[in-house]
From Swiss-Prot:
Post-translational modification: N-glycosylated.
Keyword terms: Autophagy, Cell membrane, Endosome, Glycoprotein, Golgi apparatus, Lysosome, Membrane, Signal, Transmembrane, Transmembrane helix
Name of the featured protein: Transmembrane protein 59
Species lineage: Eukaryota, Metazoa, Chordata, Craniata, Vertebrata
Chain ranges on the Extracellular side, renumbered to this chain: 36-238
Pfam (any one): BSMAP
Cross-referenced PANTHER family: TRANSMEMBRANE PROTEIN 59, TRANSMEMBRANE PROTEIN 59-LIKE PROTEIN
Amino acid sequence: MAAPKGSLWVRAQLGLLPLLLLTMALAGGPGTASAEAFDSVLGDTASCHRACQLTYPLHTYPKEEELYACQRGCRLFSICQFVDDGIDLNRTKLECESACTEAYSQSDEQYACHLGCQNQLPFAELRQEQLMSLMPKMHLLFPLTLVRSFWSDVMDSAQSFITSSWTFYLQADDGKIVIFQSKPEIQYAPQLEQEPTNLKESSLSKMSYLQMRSSQAHRNYLEDGENDGFLRCLSLNSGWILTMTLVLSVMVLLWICCATVATAVEQYVPSEKLSIYGDLEFVNEQKLNRYPASSLVLVRSKAEDHDEAGPLPTKVNLAHSEI
C-alpha cells in the first residue's frame, strides 16, 4: 500500500515533536514558557484535549493509549495547519488523518487519533474567524474625513502666511494724510481672583466686589464666546462645508439638465406640401361645391400668323345661358 501524500514532512514533524517535548521536560521551569510559546504559534489545543478527556475518561477506559492518541491528533492537526498556513482546513484534516494512520497501527488508536483531528477542526475555524475580525477595515466615511483633514491643513498653512491688520487713513488739518496700521490684539478673559483663605480677615465689601467682578468677567466671556462661536465653527468645519457645497452644486446641475430635457419643445418641422394639395384642403375646409365637367365652356381661337395676341373672348353669364 502506497504511503499517503505528504507523509515525509508528517514523519519529520512526528519525529521533531518528541524532541521538542524532551527539551522542554529537561528545561524544567522554562519548559512551561516554551510550551506557551508553541501554543501561541501552533494554536491552543486545550479545548480539544478536554474534549478527548470527556470522550475517553480514565474510569471507563483504563488504558491511556487511546486518550493520548486523541490528544496527539489535536496536536497533529495544529502542526498540519501551521505548515499549510491554514489555507484549507478540510485538506488539513485529511493530512492529519493520514498522519494518524501512519503513526498508529491499531484500529482503536487510529480512531482516537482521527477523533482528535475532528475535534480540533471547529476550534481552528473559530480562531480563523477571530483573526479575520481583527483585520483593519476601511470605514465608509474615511474619504470624507481624509478630505476634511487635507482641507484643514491647507487652511492652516494659508493662515500662517496671511497676516491680517487694521489700517486707518486720517487727514490732518494741514492736509497731510496719516496712516495708522496695527495688528489684531488677542484679548484674554480676565482671571478670577482667588478668595482669601482666611475668612475672618475678609470683609463684606471685598466679597461683594469679587462677586461683581467675577459676574462681569463671566458675562464678557459669554459675549465674546457668542460672537466668535459662529466664526470658530466655520473655521473648524470648513472641510465639511466645502464638501457639501460641491455635492449640492453637482446635484443642482444634474437637476437642471434633467428638467431642461424633460420640458424642451419638440423641434418638429412639418414637410412642405404641394400647392395642389393645399387647394384641395382649402376646398374641403370651405365646403365648396365643384362644377361638373358638363357645365364648362371651352373657347378656342384659331392660330394667326402674326405674333400679337388676339382679342379676349366675350364674357358669358353662365346663369342666363342654357346649354
